[in-house]
């Protein structure tokens, strides 16, 4: 009999290293800022006052004043960038102060290229109109070089940027995010470099084969099964792998295992490894396989993330759900006899007390 198991895990995506082609090097005393984004996680930014002193001074002044607290990411284009910091939430607001554009077409040498993870200032057609709105590159965009003031880089939390871009609900090709769906920056504050480096180290450790998965935000820590690792894929999706078996995960949550009865019913309905990803988006199929009603399942759906748990485990499941960073998409994974032991090792570590 073919066995099925569900691996429901916290997915971490990783910050890419600085490009070898970049002329700038991270100074030990470069200021660091953290953006805490509700339901997503923390983005640590290293700023470069040696490259764009006016821009960095302006950004830090706004951070120190609490200006960004409660503002949002209002424009998101996956494969391009995520823009935020507008007090009106529509791209037209400013801080009441405009600064000189520090880029080559405006007479200022700025060697920082608009690569993935780079932080830059938004502006209108006026080269000196930048004020408070910023954007973080989701992918390289060399056509922006020389025309916008790049002034920093993500050093930890690029996975948060990936999640923002992957989960954004936009209404047009310009990346407009409806007000009610805009990710909220709960806090923007200066951060210790040691704090940022520790976050980056956790990302690296969680991405290594073997080792310990450590996520202080959710209070979870468990040994990675032998032969398994969390890796970054070209499309920004992470995958657990154990040789031949690769399991796609876009969830940013901790998930619970289905009971054997639900797995049996799910298999009896004709679902196979190849069809599970498609079925993951069918709430009716989930409700039937889990033995819960459509209303119960809807109740467990938050910001586009499907939450599936057997009724007896609901309280514990919701606890773990809230500990995780939401706005992911759960992918139900089917394993064969070879994969089940490794999957169950992870699930065992996530058992609710």
Regions picked out by a protein language model, each given a short descriptive name:
Residues 1-7:
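Bacterial N-terminal signal peptides that target proteins for export
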Residues 8, 12-16:
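Hydrophobic core
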Residues 22-209, 256, 304, 334, ...:
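Cyclophilin-like peptidyl-prolyl cis-trans isomerases
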Residues 40-42, 129, 219-221, 246, ...:
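Short, mixed charged/polar active-site loops
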Residues 41, 203-238:
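N-terminal "mature-domain start" segment
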Residues 107-110, 234-329, 334-338:
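Conserved polar/disulfide-associated segments of primarily extracytoplasmic proteins
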Residues 185-186, 192-193, 228, 328-353:
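Surface-exposed amphipathic alpha-helical segments
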Residues 193-202, 232-244:
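Short acidic, Gly/Pro-enriched loop/turn segments at secondary-structure junctions
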């Amino acid at each position: 009999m073919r066995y099925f198991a569900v691996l429901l895990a916290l997915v971490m995506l990783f910050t890419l290293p600085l490009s070898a082609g970049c002329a700038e090097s991270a100074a030990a005393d470069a200021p660091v800022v953290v953006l805490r984004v509700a339901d997503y996680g923390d983005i640590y930014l290293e700023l470069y006052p040696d490259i764009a002193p006016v821009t960095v001074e302006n950004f830090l002044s706004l951070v120190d004043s609490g200006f960004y607290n409660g503002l949002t990411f209002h424009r998101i284009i996956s494969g391009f960038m995520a823009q935020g910091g507008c007090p009106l939430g529509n791209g037209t607001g400013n801080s009441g102060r405009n600064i000189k554009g520090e880029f080559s077409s405006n007479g200022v040498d700025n060697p920082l290229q608009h690569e993935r993870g780079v932080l830059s200032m938004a502006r209108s057609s006026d080269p000196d109109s930048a004020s408070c709105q910023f954007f973080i590159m989701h992918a390289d965009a060399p056509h922006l070089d020389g025309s916008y003031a790049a002034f920093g880089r993500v050093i930890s939390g690029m996975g948060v940027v990936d999640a923002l871009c992957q989960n954004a609900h936009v209404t047009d090709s310009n990346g407009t995010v409806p007000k009610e769906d805009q990710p909220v920056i709960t806090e923007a504050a200066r951060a210790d470099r040691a704090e940022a480096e520790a976050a980056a180290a956790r990302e690296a450790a969680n991405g290594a084969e073997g080792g310990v998965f450590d996520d202080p935000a959710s209070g979870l820590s468990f040994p990675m099964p032998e032969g398994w690792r969390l890796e970054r894929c070209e499309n920004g999706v992470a995958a657990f792998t154990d040789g031949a078996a690769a399991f796609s995960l876009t969830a940013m949550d901790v998930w619970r295992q289905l009971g054997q009865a639900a797995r049996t019913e799910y298999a009896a309905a004709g679902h196979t490894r190849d069809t599970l990803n498609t079925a993951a988006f069918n709430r009716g199929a989930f409700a039937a396989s889990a033995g819960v009603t459509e209303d119960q399942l809807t109740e467990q759906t938050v910001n586009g993330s499907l939450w599936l748990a057997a009724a007896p485990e609901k309280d514990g499941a919701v606890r773990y759900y809230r500990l995780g960073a939401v706005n992911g998409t759960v992918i139900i994974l089917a394993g064969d006899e070879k994969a089940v032991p490794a999957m169950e090792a992870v699930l065992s570590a996530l058992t609710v007390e």
